[in-house]
Amino acid sequence: MPRLAAKLLLVPLLAVMLALPAQAECYVDYKAKQDDPLRLAYGVSQVSDAVCGKPKQAKAELAPRLAADGWTLLKILSSFGPEGLSERKESAGDFYLRY
């Protein structure tokens, strides 16, 4: 009987372990600015799954990437999966998955 119980527990455990490597993709859309002259931008970037749905953490991850090119991240607007990419591509223009 203990072997049967162990096998019954092993099946769900294996299912969970196999599912772990398949992580979802996470993206955010944001607003940023550059000074002198003032430029405003709307963009879309990929962020780590760990910050998905957490605007403050996503901002902390994305801000340094933008700052490297002289941009200041103003706001994370939303986070979404790959299904939301196509509807934002045109609006983001040059800032689509740039950072």
Predicted regions and their residues:
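Terminus-proximal functional modules
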Residues: P2-Y99
